[in-house]
């Protein structure tokens, strides 16, 4: 049976990563497996920033956002020679497998290690909810609640001043956060990269809302679709109503994780340990229909595509 495993977090931090780290460590220790934490992601793996962790190492972290292990961008990990040096560090400590918590860039690193014969398990840790093979990623629910609270606050002031608010949220090229926030926050309009938008159609919809007696409007938009300040200016010129853009930015990544994210991270962390005990390497874990599943990590990255949530998108159109 496997005797030593490592765990690292990589890429952008997400609330619930600490809960996942805690789960991996305590589930492994409960089954007699030693656990080593790698600080600062793949950079720390290459620089040998590796330490043995115990149960007390993860006391009082389940409620904390961010990641106790730290994270870092490390483009040089794409180079095979760099990865070989990283594997040499793992072998030096006797670490037989690695649990990687992060987004698609982190998965790519785990895929590369897997292709070199080193077993890895990927856990989806990103607020963007853009990982194939899972309905939800660790951190998405917490970020959604942060965005929803921001929309609630903006609605208060927008109603008071008969103002239109354009709210930019994270998500990179995935509109899940913008759509879920639109439904949960009661936004009038949502703009996502999967669907794009025509400015004339948006303006016509806003005109329709004003004609029906609406005193304000909330528009949620995924980052990178368009310049939100320019869009706000366009809307204000067209309608004559004060329009302001709010870019929520990195506030969406921080804060104490929700109960849903803590439970999801805990389930996935323990499941990763079970898979490694079974001799399963090169896998990534997901949650589908509330059941834990695992996929081949190479197949997940190369062939699986995350489906667009048409139901949620259509709901935003009905409920505005």
Curated annotation (Swiss-Prot):
Q: What are the protein's UniProt keywords?
A: Allosteric enzyme, ATP-binding, Cytoplasm, Glycolysis, Kinase, Magnesium, Metal-binding, Nucleotide-binding, Transferase
Q: Which cofactor does it need?
A: Mg(2+)
Q: How is its activity regulated?
A: Allosterically activated by ADP and other diphosphonucleosides, and allosterically inhibited by phosphoenolpyruvate.
Residues holding substrate: 126-128, 163, 170-172, 223, 244, 250-253
Range of residues in the leader sequence: none
The name this protein goes by in its record:
ATP-dependent 6-phosphofructokinase
GO biological process: one example: fructose 1,6-bisphosphate metabolic process
Tell me, what does this protein do in biology?
Catalyzes the phosphorylation of D-fructose 6-phosphate to fructose 1,6-bisphosphate by ATP, the first committing step of glycolysis.
Please report which protein family the annotation says this sequence is part of.
Belongs to the phosphofructokinase type A (PFKA) family. ATP-dependent PFK group I subfamily. Prokaryotic clade 'B1' sub-subfamily.
Checking Pfam families in the record gives: PFK (PF00365)
**Pathway, per Swiss-Prot/TrEMBL?**
Carbohydrate degradation; glycolysis; D-glyceraldehyde 3-phosphate and glycerone phosphate from D-glucose: step 3/4
Q: Which residues bind Mg(2+)?
A: 104
Q: Which residues form a coiled coil?
A: none
What does the record note on quaternary structure?
Homotetramer.
| Classification lineage | Bacteria, Pseudomonadati, Pseudomonadota, Gammaproteobacteria, Aeromonadales
| GO annotations of cellular component type | 6-phosphofructokinase complex
Q: What is its EC number?
A: 2.7.1.11
Query: Where, in this chain's numbering, is ATP bound?
Result: 12, 73-74, 103-106
């Amino acid at each position: 049976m496997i005797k030593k495993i490592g765990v690292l977090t990589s890429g952008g931090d997400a609330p619930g990563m600490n809960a996942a780290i805690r789960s991996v460590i305590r589930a492994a220790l409960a089954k007699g497996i030693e656990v080593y934490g790698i600080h600062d992601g793949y950079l720390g793996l290459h620089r040998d920033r590796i330490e043995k962790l115990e149960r007390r190492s993860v006391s009082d972290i389940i409620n904390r956002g961010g990641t106790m292990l730290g994270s870092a961008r490390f483009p040089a990990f794409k180079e095979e020679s760099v990865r070989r040096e990283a594997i040499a560090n793992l072998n030096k400590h006797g670490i037989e497998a690695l649990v990687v918590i992060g987004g698609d860039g982190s998965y790519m690193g785990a895929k590369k290690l897997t292709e070199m014969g080193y077993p890895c398990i990927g856990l989806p840790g990103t607020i963007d909810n853009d990982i194939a093979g899972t309905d939800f990623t660790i951190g998405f629910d917490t970020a959604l609640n942060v965005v929803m609270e921001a929309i609630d606050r903006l609605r208060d002031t927008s109603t008071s001043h008969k103002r239109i608010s354009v709210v930019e949220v994270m998500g990179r090229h995935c509109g899940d956060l913008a759509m879920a926030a639109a439904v949960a926050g009661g936004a009038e309009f949502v703009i996502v990269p999967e669907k794009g938008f025509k400015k004339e159609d948006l303006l016509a919809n806003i005109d329709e809302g004003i004609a029906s007696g609406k005193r304000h409007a909330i528009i949620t938009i995924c980052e990178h679709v368009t310049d939100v300040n320019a869009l706000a200016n366009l809307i204000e010129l067209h309608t004559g109503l004060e329009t302001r853009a709010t870019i929520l930015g990195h506030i969406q990544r921080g804060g104490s994780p929700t109960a849903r994210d803590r439970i999801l991270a805990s389930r996935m962390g323990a499941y990763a340990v079970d898979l490694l005990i079974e001799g399963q390497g090169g896998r990534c874990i997901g949650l589908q229909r509330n059941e834990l599943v695992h996929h081949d990590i190479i197949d997940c990255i190369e062939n699986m595509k995350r489906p667009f949530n048409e139901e949620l998108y259509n709901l935003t159109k009905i409920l505005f």
